[in-house]
């Protein structure tokens, strides 16, 4: 049983989109990865339309169970952050039109999920994406690898929980193999989940 997630690394010039199938044992398989590009000289409304059409086509072609988008965070370049926010809005709207659940994940959440370290650099994330997916190298440009990381992050952080009650979600795939070996990233994330669970279950002392 698998969950299919479409991940989006929003950007106006380059919007990375990656689709992965993730089994209940957290093994991930690459389905598709691409980058939607729009030229800077194109009118803004046409650029957003092109990105929206590209995302819509991929949603309709691969029928994911969920969509995951990188959450906008503060950047020094105001024009860049505005473009990212605009594309994020288009992606949210396009997914909502199809009744798909959408999750937003911060860069730190994605890094922690993929590498086990929330301050990992881009090269470390890209290397782990390639390793998790069994690829000889990370897809290029970086926007493509980032989109895959976002999709994997969502599946590992909560998307797989639906499998425990509803069976296969999204595209059909091979059944999970109980007790299968985890990748280093998967093992680190599972250990982090256990640590978080222990911490959250302990009584908290009120501040004085």
UniProtKB/Swiss-Prot annotation:
- List the PROSITE patterns: RUVC
Identify the EC number(s): 3.1.21.10
GO biological processes: DNA recombination; DNA repair
Tell me how the cofactor is bound: Binds 2 Mg(2+) ion per subunit.
What terms describe the molecular function in GO for this protein? crossover junction DNA endonuclease activity; DNA binding; magnesium ion binding
The entry assigns this protein to a family as follows: Belongs to the RuvC family.
Instruction: Describe the subunit structure.
Output: Homodimer which binds Holliday junction (HJ) DNA. The HJ becomes 2-fold symmetrical on binding to RuvC with unstacked arms; it has a different conformation from HJ DNA in complex with RuvA. In the full resolvosome a probable DNA-RuvA(4)-RuvB(12)-RuvC(2) complex forms which resolves the HJ.
Q: What is this protein called?
A: Crossover junction endodeoxyribonuclease RuvC
Q: What species is given as this protein's source?
A: Leifsonia xyli subsp. xyli (strain CTCB07)
